[in-house]
Amino acid sequence: MEEILATLKEQQTTRKIHHLPVIHHGQVFVRRASIGDVDQIYDIACSVGKTRKDSYQGFLIDDYKADPEYYKAKFKGAVFELNHFYVAERSDVLLGFLMAYTKKQWLAKNPGWIEEIHWHPEFDMKKTENFVLVDKTAIRADLTSRGIGSRLYRKLIRDVRAREVHNLFGETVVDPVPNFASLAFRKKQNYTLAGVHYERYNGKIVTDLVYHRFV
């Protein structure tokens, strides 16, 4: 893991985009997503959800340009359904988004999820009694590594604590294409490895690492 993170840091340094303005914390506002945000949310997803996956920049597993109507409809549904769907914006321009599900919402979509995980032998299963699962965190491809994801997480954590939920889960793809950027973010956010999940996606087996964080 340390070698992976060191390589990631080197890649990010060499690939830094110098011409972009620095985003100061005071300029970025995080709020709940609304139906009027869907087009920009879709654009952000397209910027990191492509056919070709970039391990060091980070990616979403889906190819969003393949079916715009389908994915926009999914985002619209999520705006109405989810308690924790947030966007980060500056001057009415969305910079990133975060989608998270309560346990009830997640298991309604993935009823066998808990049983499908190969849990770490020392993981305390009581932590699955009540949780929120972060399904997607996406930042515009040209604005990564600028603290936007951390701001989205701070809003999420405040809200889940207010609901007296203290367990967060998230999954990171490691095969067939490893998401090194996501692995680095898990470490930054103090997640610990909880298990491994194998799932079939587009006819292939995808391997995800399942991470847990107490908040």
Walk through the language-model features, giving the residues of each.
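A short helix-loop-beta-strand connector motif used in the catalytic cores of GNAT acetyltransferases and
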Residues: 72-87, 103-108, 133
